[in-house]
Amino acid sequence: MAAKDVVFGDAARAKMVEGVNILANAVKVTLGPKGRNVVLERSFGGPTVTKDGVSVAKEIELKDKLQNMGAQMVKEVASKTSDNAGDGTTTATVLAQSIVREGMKFVAAGMNPMDLKRGIDKAVGAAVEELKKISKPTTTSKEIAQVGAISANSDASIGERIAEAMDKVGKEGVITVEDGKSLADELEVVEGMQFDRGYLSPYFINNPEKQVVALDNPFVLLFDKKISNIRDLLPVLEQVAKAGRPLLIIAEDVEGEALATLVVNNIRGILKTAAVKAPGFGDRRKAMLEDIAILTGGTVIAEEVGLTLEKATLNDLGQAKRIEIGKENTIIIDGAGDAAGIEGRVKQIRAQIEEATSDYDREKLQERVAKLAGGVAVIKVGAATEVEMKEKKARVEDALHATRAAVEEGIVPGGGVALLRARAAISALQGDNADQNAGIKIVLRAMEEPLRQIVLNAGEEASVVVAKVIEGKGNYGYNAASGEYGDLVEMGVLDPTKVTRTALQNAASVASLMLTTDCAVAETPKEESAPAMPGGMGGMGGMEGMM
């Protein structure tokens, strides 16, 4: 085991604070509409230019072990805020730096760090309650567009695209971000349910121009096992042929004789059919088959429920208005399922989302809800160069998270004003002793910091602007983009409540940990000894005798 350096008290804290300041100073220049860019070196390819706080934070690794500990703790604030709320990483970093900086002064003056922490926690609790009171629900598409624009560093077109996508697929719908092919941003909406399985044979294609299988008003057969024997399928095929409608078979697999017979029937025009594999794997496959059954008003034919292929009737089959099958995707449009049944299924999946422990499971369940409830929207980001594309895509993703957060918990005035207004609830707070009161003061001072930084980045005098905004009431604040004072909500400068709340809570949590740290243990840096000199040309002394 490597030897360790153990550092106590002020010496440990001072080094960690240096690390906090290095990271926070690099991140906070990106805050606000006039935030500056940060250039990140890449080991391959060109450098990346970003205004995204968490991207900057993730790049920073310091040589000094103790400084690095401080930096990593603040990086945790940014990452945690990004994971929970999807935005607000720079605000959280600025708040954490301020709480650490002010707190260290009181610790150095001999105050009890544990009481300071209690005071900080008390103040943050009161501020969060006040933020909830200030918060208003997002109701209009315009508000959603404004939140998106602010989060995308004041890019109105991104906000509008996201609002448009939410209008099309609903607030629960899946919205994904992809690289576009042109210079302009595009929005593509897939109505109905889409899953990532294509046709099993190209011979099913009936629209050669688009290279897709298009089935109008088809029946849908759902089976949870492989189909290889055509005899099992014959009774159903005969009933469908009599009805004179197309058939889509969704099963674990369709192979051999069964697939060959379907293809031959299709080519001869006896029965218009297509077959695709069921989406997902294992238990998720069963759940998704059940989703499709509810959407199309059919039944999954499974031995567990006592149903077999030979005994299946038209009543067991689902129906849809139209189904399109490409090489890699199948889209079911306007399934014949019962609205109440679909709503019940959505509620059931939402309950599973609440209980899900892994992010992957939660994401997959949310996709299932969206597929049942609305549809899928794809925002294709356009840019002139790859560097610009990466930077813009990161901003669109941030904006998307922010708008989701706004829909979830509502909005507050942006530009650092919500935190200033929430100070009203703290100013009258009293702790149990003088040290706790000092903790409350630390938070009061920190809550001015985001506005100060926004103003500094805009090149104005912070103290003057903060004093003027404090004099105002409600939504009155400073719009750094235009340099004007006024009602920020009317100007469209909005922040999601969830983002502001999460930033404050995470910043206070990590900063309190740092204030109550009294010892740091780090690996002793290895001293690299200089390599030995190469051997000389010794032993050549007896050469005279050879002359």
Curated annotation (Swiss-Prot):
EC number: 5.6.1.7
Keywords: ATP-binding, Chaperone, Cytoplasm, Isomerase, Nucleotide-binding
Matches recorded under PROSITE patterns: CHAPERONINS_CPN60
Origin: domain of life: Bacteria
Pfam families given in the database record: Cpn60_TCP1
Binding site for ATP: 30-33, 51, 87-91, 415, 479-481, 495
UniProt-recorded Gene Ontology molecular function terms: ATP binding; ATP-dependent protein folding chaperone; isomerase activity; unfolded protein binding
InterPro entries listed in its UniProt record: Chaperonin_Cpn60_CS, Cpn60/GroEL, Cpn60/GroEL/TCP-1, GroEL-like_apical_dom_sf, GROEL-like_equatorial_sf, TCP-1-like_intermed_sf
Places the protein is found: Cytoplasm
Any Gene Ontology biological process: protein refolding
Catalytic activity: ATP + H2O + a folded polypeptide = ADP + phosphate + an unfolded polypeptide
NCBIfam families: GroEL, PRK00013.1, PRK12849.1, PRK12850.1, PRK12851.1
Subunit structure, as described in the record: Forms a cylinder of 14 subunits composed of two heptameric rings stacked back-to-back. Interacts with the co-chaperonin GroES.
Record PANTHER family: 60 KDA HEAT SHOCK PROTEIN, MITOCHONDRIAL (PTHR45633)
Family: Belongs to the chaperonin (HSP60) family.
Name this protein carries in UniProt: Chaperonin GroEL
Organism of origin: Cupriavidus taiwanensis (strain DSM 17343 / BCRC 17206 / CCUG 44338 / CIP 107171 / LMG 19424 / R1)
